[in-house]
Regions:
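Class I S-adenosyl-L-methionine
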Residues: 1-119
Length: 119
C-alpha cells in the first residue's frame, strides 16, 4: 500500500509526509522518538517526506512506559506496559484517548515538531 500511496502523492505535485513504523518500505525517512520530546514513551516512527524535514535525536536515558498490548502487561525484556489509562495518556502526551486509541496513536508532539518545520 505504501508504494501506491507514494505514487499518488508524488503525482499530486504537492508536499507530502507518509508515516509508518521502523522497517517499513519508506524512502529516506526521518525518525522521531518520544524521548526526544520529553515523553515517557519511545514510540519510534518513520516519516518519508519531500519537504527536507529533520528527524529527532533519541534520549533513551530513562526506562520507557509501554503503551501497546494490554494495560499492566509484563514486557519480555523487562518492564511493564502502563498500569493505568492516566499513566498511558501522560506518557504519550494525549489526555483524551482510550487505550485502544493510545496503542495506535502518534504523539501530538510529533505533529507539532513536523508542523513547525513546515511553517
Amino acid at each position: 500500500m505504501i508504494p501506491e500511496t507514494r505514487k499518488a502523492l508524488i503525482a499530486s505535485g504537492k508536499s507530502y509526509i507518509i508515516e509508518n513504523v521502523p522497517l517499513s518500505p519508506l524512502i529516506n525517512p526521518i525518525r522521531l522518538c518520544g524521548s526526544s520530546f520529553g515523553l515517557k514513551v519511545r514510540r519510534h516512527r518513520l516519516f518519508e517526506n519531500n519537504l527536507n524535514l529533520e528527524g529527532s535525536i533519541c534520549n533513551h536515558k530513562e526506562r520507557p512506559i509501554g503503551v501497546y498490548g494490554s494495560l499492566n502487561d509484563e514486557i519480555p525484556k523487562g518492564g511493564k506496559t502502563a498500569e493505568t489509562i492516566g499513566q498511558a495518556r501522560e506518557a504519550m502526551g494525549i489526555d483524551w484517548a482510550i487505550w485502544t486509541e493510545l496503542v495506535e496513536a502518534i504523539p501530538p508532539a510529533y505533529t507539532k515538531y513536523l508542523g513547525n518545520q513546515i511553517e
